Structure formats: C-alpha cells, structure tokens
Regions:
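Short alpha-helical
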Residues: 63-64, 88
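A generic structural signal for short, solvent-exposed coil/turn residues
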Residues: 48, 85-87, 97
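Residue-level recognition of alpha-helix initiation/capping sites
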Residues: 38, 64, 140-143
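Short, basic and Ser/Thr-rich N-terminal targeting/leader segments
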Residues: 50, 76, 87-89
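Glycine-rich phosphate/adenosyl-contacting loop at the front of the ribokinase-like
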Residues: 1-59, 66-68
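Ribokinase/PfkB-type carbohydrate-kinase core domain
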Residues: 1-9, 59, 70-83, 97-166
C-alpha cells in the first residue's frame, strides 16, 4: 500500500537559549542547529524508517532555504515532485529554553501557496493512502487541496489521513 504524503518541507533553525528575551533585550545563544523539517517531511521520514512505500509531495522553491531542503531530500533519497522556481521555501526559528519549552517564529514560503496545477502531474492510481499535513489545509491552499481531492479517481476507496497541527 503506497502513501502520498502532501504538505510542507521547511528549514528549522533551532537556537538553544537559557530563556526567552524580554522585549528589546539581547541574549546569547548557547547552540544552533539547522535541519530540514516540516510535518510532511517528518512523516515521510518516519514512513521511510518503517520501510513503507510512499512518495513525498512538497513544493521546493528556489533560494537559500529551498537549496537546504533540496539537499536534505536528496540525502534521504527523495526527488522533488513539485518545483516552484518563483519563491523560496519558508523557515521556522525555534527558540528552545533550558527547560525544553519551545517557541516558534515561522516565515512562510512556497510550501504555503499550493497551486491547482501541481496536482495534475500526480498519477493517483499509484496510491492507496493520502496523508495531508494540516498546516497546508488552512486558507487558500486548503481550498485547492480540497478541490483536488474531489477530482481524485475513486477517492472514496482511498484512506485519507489529515493531521491537524493546531
């Protein structure tokens, strides 16, 4: 049973800090780490580790963050299904406090601007399962994904998993 994982790949910029700064305050960062993340990317990697057949359908733009994502995908054996040259991918600044509490600041990019024509390239007969990351079903992208699902042949026979982020 093959799964199509639809959603986002973004760059996570993680910074370990003792505590969050007060407004206007400057504090030192103990450690930084840059990794590829995003719900769909993380789910695909879990499926990969479990040896489940799947494809990762995330838009990869053009720019410095898209380049990091493209390299991360290649390292995991993924080829971009969607190339969006007009926009860079987004990133998330994660502030991790000493007690482990995490605070996020997200800059959206190509992964939040789904286009109807992206789905025209996908042979849905290959998939029994469809996983959709919830962050992508918000706003206009959600409308586009919902409209696409209505056009999927035999959609009622497929297992659809929707992950709600918030």
């Amino acid at each position: 049973m093959r799964t199509l994982v639809v959603g986002a790949a973004i760059v996570d910029l993680m910074m370990k800090v003792e505590r969050l700064p007060k407004s206007g305050e400057d504090i030192p960062c103990k450690e930084t780490k840059t990794v590829v993340g995003g719900c769909a990317y993380n789910v695909a990697n879990t499926l990969r580790n479990l040896k489940c057949e799947h494809d990762l359908c995330v838009p990869v733009g053009s720019g410095s963050f898209a380049d990091i994502i493209r390299r991360g995908m290649k390292e995991k054996g993924y080829e971009p299904m969607i190339e969006e040259p007009g926009e860079d991918n987004g990133y998330c600044l994660s502030l991790v406090e000493a007690d482990g509490e995490r605070t996020f600041i997200t800059v959206q990019g190509a992964e939040c601007h789904f286009k109807k024509e992206w789905f025209n390239r996908i042979d849905m007969d290959r998939y029994e399962n469809i996983y959709i990351a919830g962050y992508q079903v918000c706003g206009k992208s959600g409308e586009i994904i919902s409209q696409w699902l209505k056009t999927v042949p035999n959609v009622e026979e497929k297992h659809i998993f929707l992950h709600r982020d918030r």
